[in-house]
Swiss-Prot record:
Species whose genome carries this gene: Escherichia coli O157:H7
InterPro entries in alphabetical order: Plug_dom, Plug_dom_sf, TonB-dep_rcpt-like, TonB-dep_rcpt_b-brl, TonB_box_CS, TonB_rcpt_b-brl_sf, TonB_sidphr_rcpt
Pfam family, one: TonB_dep_Rec_b-barrel
Protein's name in the database: Catecholate siderophore receptor Fiu
Keyword Ubl conjugation among UniProt keywords: no
Species classification: Bacteria, Pseudomonadati, Pseudomonadota, Gammaproteobacteria, Enterobacterales
Gene name per UniProt: fiu
Length: 760
């Protein structure tokens, strides 16, 4: 069993490995970079290199003024071409191209996660997802039909975006009108009744105006899971004025609706590490795994959401070297769901007979009825200039943002128990009814920032940046009085049972100072080494707009607590080789997270907890030859508690839901003018599970490999087909597990997707 929990290769100490990697990669990269260069006496031939469609050279965010190859951060840019070739229809699928990033956590106890529940380097990053550099709120699945590229930055992003997760951020870049006309359409069918269509129309009007329309529709069952369905539709019209001139105006709108049947997971009975929760239920130790197709929800389970986003961006080129941009965005994400979760503790199991096939587990109804809104105005100025002999690449700006969240209180839904091995979903508890016991959160933020990259010599650069956020968060919540169970409150005199009673009404204000500094030295024209240090903070309420009263319990959102603080050090090297078609990177990193909440000996709580995530990461992106494209990477990361209570089920100091080893690689080859072949593999190492007192549940998930493949055929310039096969070898694996360990989400089995792409 121990062998299954480790990456199937000999492990090296990370520092030794990285030192060897840097020593080894430098001469190899130098040799590759020199390939095709002429001697001094040879005739010089200037030949432009075609940019790789797998390795965008520049971030679309103006806050990152340097090319990806000269950015002193670990950054992965997933291009639209990669997304299309892999048939990745949502953000979670696209992020499979980034090692160690994924939806590994299935929720707390009786609660389950929904949407893009992303973990990165030991931390929940689902609230650090941005669209065009603006925070996108909501636990929904984000479709890629209107996405130009996805930018993943590892390490603190507080200097770039303000309050954020301590270990990274994700930025989805929207499609914009272009100065050319064309139509791209696709129609897909696949396993589990998968049906999807997209349309991308760009039309030039006159010399400087263009309109673009992106449309999407998708209906599918979840492969390998009975009753689980997904249905979503989207439309994204946009118009641009002044293209090719010094003044440009972009107007964008996005509307997406989703009607899904959520998946609460299946019991972990029979998984490695599972044992019955009591002597009386010992039969479960040898009764075998449940059928992974089983659905433990009800016919009334649903997950509906609506996203509406309107954006206006104006750009003005003051001169050839200076541009000012102003962006205004309003966005609203509404979501409501009823999702069933199962609990398998000793008190949750009913045994009508000795036959385990008659046993039941209790069901819990997870409910949510929430509305998230954001209104922001952001101004950015970028400029390149010299002071004496020192070059400057400056990005500076101000931001005004109001974010609000309303969680509508709903009456509890009671569900009957469910048979462990033969679940029945034909139950109709009804929908949600609001009871007025709402929770309201609002955060107003004013931010100012300035970044500069200083070109000291031709080969040596210094960079730094600072951001000041002034924030004010207000929060109030109510509870329906007279209920029972955890969190119940009695009704005040004269107040009827079930009436909402305010339990929290508080606010918190403060200032956050985040900063970063780095240095880069070009060893050659195509290769560099760099160092970087960054500081990021997350204040109470910064993650979910919820606050807790001063002195009340162990919540990190207490108003008397300090912001969580993360410090990251990184040293790395980046090389553009093979005529700059291929980017190779390697980095060694360490992130220390401070001010974590821990319990004192007297039962009170303080912020003396510390976590650390350290390791190394290597990556590759671009073209090996003009016909051979590749993107991938490998990371080794050790995430531990340095000070405070251990939170892993096995009692170790490891942080849960973080694979120590992770690998991903996708490669595509254009075999002929009309035929292309692609293949990829991913490895997710063993992960520790969190601890919450559950008895007998698995303490870890086993590592696994998954392979995918693609075959493309071009009929003519207007039509091509592609066949994608996912989980080629039909690997059985645990995709995510919840904190208690009573339930998990099985990985998707082997599936097929056939797509017709049309171009006009």
């Amino acid at each position: 069993m121990e062998n299954n929990r480790n990456f199937p290769a000999r492990q090296f100490h990370s520092l030794t490995f990285f030192a060897g990697l840097c020593i080894g990669i430098t001469p190899v990269a130098q040799a590759l970079a020199a390939e095709g260069q002429t001697n001094a006496d040879d005739t010089l031939v200037v030949e432009a290199s075609t940019p790789s469609l797998y390795a965008p050279q520049q971030s679309a965010d103006p806050k990152f003024s340097r090319p990806v190859a000269d950015t002193t951060r670990t950054m992965t840019v997933i291009s639209e071409q990669v997304i299309k070739d892999q048939g990745a229809t949502n953000l979670t699928d696209a992020l499979k191209n980034v090692p160690g990033v994924g939806a590994f956590f299935a929720g707390e106890n009786g609660n389950s996660t929904t949407g893009d529940a992303i973990y990165m380097r030991g931390a929940d990053t689902s609230n650090s997802i941005y669209i065009d550099g603006i925070r996108d709120i909501g636990s929904v699945s984000r479709d890629t039909f209107n996405t130009e590229q996805v930018e993943v930055i590892k390490g603190p992003s507080g200097t770039d975006y303000g309050r954020s997760a301590p270990t990274g951020s994700i930025n989805m870049i929207s499609k914009q009108p272009r100065n050319d006309s064309g139509i791209d359409a696709s129609a897909s069918i696949g396993s589990a009744w998968f049906r999807r269509g997209t349309l991308d129309v760009n039309q030039v009007i006159g010399d400087t105006t263009a309109v673009r329309l992106n449309v999407m529709g998708e209906k599918t069952h979840d492969a390998g899971r009975d009753k689980v369905k997904n249905e979503r539709y989207g439309v994204a019209p946009s118009i641009a004025f002044g293209l090719g001139t010094a003044n440009r105006l972009y107007l964008n709108y996005l509307h997406v609706t989703q009607h899904n049947t959520p998946d609460g997971g299946i019991p972990t009975i029979g998984l490695p590490g599972y044992s019955a929760p009591s002597a009386g239920t010992a039969t479960l130790n040898h009764s075998g795994k449940v059928d992974t197709h089983n659905f433990y929800g009800t016919d009334s389970d649903y997950d509906d959401s609506t996203t509406d986003t309107a954006t206006m961006r104006f750009e003005h080129d003051i001169n050839d070297n200076t541009t000012i941009r102003n962006t205004t965005r309003w966005s609203r994400v509404k979501q409501d769901y009823l999702m069933t979760a199962i609990m398998g503790g000793a008190s949750n199991i009913t045994q009508p007979t000795s036959d385990v096939n008659s046993w039941t587990w209790s069901r819990t109804a997870n409910t949510k009825d929430v509305s998230n809104k954001i209104l922001t105005n952001q101004t950015n100025l970028t400029s390149t200039f010299y002071t004496a002999s020192i070059g400057h690449d400056v990005s500076t700006g101000v931001e005004f943002t109001r974010e609000t969240q309303t969680n509508y209180g709903v009456n509890p839904v009671t569900l009957p128990a469910v048979n462990i091995y033969h679940p029945d979903s034909s139950i109709h508890p009804g929908g949600l009814t609001r009871n007025g016991a709402n929770a309201n959160g609002q955060t107003d933020t004013f931010a100012i920032y300035a970044f500069d990259t200083l070109q000291i010599t031709r080969d040596f650069e210094l960079n730094g940046g600072i951001r000041l956020d002034n924030y004010h968060t207000e929060y109030d919540s109510a509870t329906a009085c007279g209920g029972s169970g955890r969190g119940a409150i009695t009704c005040p005199a004269g107040v009827a049972k079930g009436s909402p009673v305010t339990t929290v009404d508080t606010a918190k204000s403060g200032n956050l100072v985040n900063w970063k500094a780095g240095a880069l030295y070009h060893l050659t024209e195509n290769g560099n080494v760099y160092i970087n240090y960054a500081v990021s903070q997350q204040p109470p309420g910064g993650n979910n707009f919820a606050l807790a009263q001063s002195g009340s319990g162990n919540s990190a959102n207490r108003t008397d607590f300090k912001p969580q603080k993360a410090n990251t050090s990184e040293i790395g090297t980046k090389w553009q080789v093979l005529d700059k078609r291929l980017l190779l990177t390697a980095a060694l990193f360490r992130t220390d997270i401070e001010n974590e909440v821990e319990q004192n000996d007297d039962g009170t709580y303080s912020q003396y907890g510390k976590k650390r995530v350290e390791g190394y990461e290597i990556s590759v992106a671009g073209n090996i030859t003009p016909a051979w494209q590749v993107i991938g990477g490998y990371t080794q990361q050790k995430a531990t508690i340095k000070n405070g209570k251990d939170v892993a089920q096995d009692g170790s100091s490891s942080l849960p839901y973080t694979p120590e080893h992770a690998f991903t690689l996708w490669s595509q080859y254009q075999a002929t003018d009309d035929i292309s072949v692609g293949a990829g593999a991913r490895y997710i190492g063993s992960m520790h599970k969190g601890s919450d007192g559950a008895v007998g549940t698995p303490a870890f998930t086993e590592g696994y490999w998954v392979a995918d493949a693609k075959l493309g055929y071009r009929v003519n310039r207007n039509l091509d087909f592609q066949l994608n096969v996912y989980n080629l070898f039909d690997t059985d694996y645990v995709a995510s597990i919840n904190k208690s360990g009573y339930r998990y989400h099985p990985g998707e089995p082997r599936t097929f997707l056939l797509t017709a792409n049309m171009h006009f």
